[in-house]
Amino acid sequence: MPPSGLRLLPLLLPLLWLLVLTPGRPAAGLSTCKTIDMELVKRKRIEAIRGQILSKLRLASPPSQGEVPPGPLPEAVLALYNSTRDRVAGESAEPEPEPEADYYAKEVTRVLMVETTNRIYDKIKKSPHSIYMLFNTSELREAVPEPVLLSRAELRLLRLKLKVEQHVELYQKYSNNSWRYLSNRLLAPSDSPEWLSFDVTGVVRQWLSRGGEIEGFRLSAHCSCDSRDNTLQVDINGLSSSRRGDLATIHGMNRPFLLLMATPLERAQHLHTSRHRRALDTNYCFSSTEKNCCVRQLYIDFRKDLGWKWIHEPKGYHANFCLGPCPYIWSLDTQYSKVLALYNQHNPGASAAPCCVPQALEPLPIVYYVGRKPKVEQLSNMIVRSCKCS
């Protein structure tokens, strides 16, 4: 009588033959990342956001609905909310630079401001408190074809001799002819000219991403409440800030300019390709049918989904979430399967495969009432912008 092992051999042959014919596949069986029902994920995300908002506002429970005054918001509160919302939108529109770009040599380009004799300056209201510097964005795009290639941008100004100390502020030309504060500088008296440099990398990336033709900066004297005279005393080569508010003619090639440091397009071709391959952000995920890890849309209506009326603005927002498998190349027929088996043995509750998690998050500005007093708050990390496998 043959041994028991030999008696079982005919039964095992079909199974062995099936394994031979089956191509190597990712070790999905070793992953503990479970597939979750989409509706269940959405419900859990909504409940998590409910607790997240209350926790960030340090509220044990939602305010009483009867405490919310009827009618529109005060103009000052609405203006503060709108400016906060615009600032967040502007910052989120900035493309994220790629770390790989630091490897390549940078090409340095100088883009001069538009001459003040150009008629585009006629649209700007002259003031003894400020000077204005406008730039043609077509020249910027010629130097830097894509925002992601920009490594650094500096606004360079040649300050002439200064008799008195002055505090100056730099502003960016923004939407609706408004100006957004960027930075400030305390200038000491000096008998010799001095180059001033402002880091405006984020601003120039915004300009390269938008379709505008003319963008610019404003340099203003700091306006203190106890000062009667806030006239700009600083003279910039190529400009004049006289008390009449006139702008002088250009003085040679040392007028204000943008110094751009960028990776040349021909050196960053593979960077461009890899960026699109890895960019699991809303621009890619919302316009594709990607089944692997990606950002999934989720709009939360505060009244409908949370039953809240105490948040006055916005009425809702796109919270989004990350979902999808993260495939990897470890197959069952490789040495890594032994490592994974050992890992699972010692960490039974952990995941051997990467999971889809948020990478970039954005804040959410809100207006809500405490009693009858409206408050504007910015809640951090409320909107999923991109995902990654980790």
Swiss-Prot record:
Chain intervals for the UniProt region annotation (Arm domain): 75-271
GO cellular component, as recorded: blood microparticle; cell surface; cytoplasm; extracellular space; nucleus
Motif (Cell attachment site): 244-246
GO MF assignments: cytokine activity; growth factor activity; type I transforming growth factor beta receptor binding; type II transforming growth factor beta receptor binding; type III transforming growth factor beta receptor binding
Residues the UniProt record annotates as site (Cleavage): R278, A279
Domain of life: Eukaryota
Disulfide bonds: C285-C294, C293-C356, C322-C387, C326-C389
First and last residue of the signal peptide: 1-29
InterPro entries registered for this protein in UniProt: Cystine-knot_cytokine, TGF-b_C, TGF-b_propeptide, TGF-beta, TGF-beta-rel, TGFb1, TGFb_CS
Bowtie tail: annotated segments: 226-252
Post-translational modification: Transforming growth factor beta-1 proprotein: The precursor proprotein is cleaved in the Golgi apparatus by FURIN to form Transforming growth factor beta-1 (TGF-beta-1) and Latency-associated peptide (LAP) chains, which remain non-covalently linked, rendering TGF-beta-1 inactive.
Region (Straightjacket domain): 30-74
Claim: Repeat is one of the keywords in the record: no
Matches recorded under Gene3D superfamilies: 2.60.120.970, Cystine-knot cytokines
Pfam families registered for this protein in UniProt: TGF_beta, TGFb_propeptide
Assembly information from the UniProt record: Homodimer; disulfide-linked. Interacts with the serine proteases, HTRA1 and HTRA3: the interaction with either inhibits TGFB1-mediated signaling and the HTRA protease activity is required for this inhibition. May interact with THSD4; this interaction may lead to sequestration by FBN1 microfibril assembly and attenuation of TGFB signaling. Interacts with CD109, DPT and ASPN. Interacts with EFEMP2. Interacts with TSKU; the interaction contributes to regulation of the hair cycle. Interacts with TGFBR3.
Similarity-based family: Belongs to the TGF-beta family.
Protein name: Transforming growth factor beta-1 proprotein
Gene (name only): TGFB1
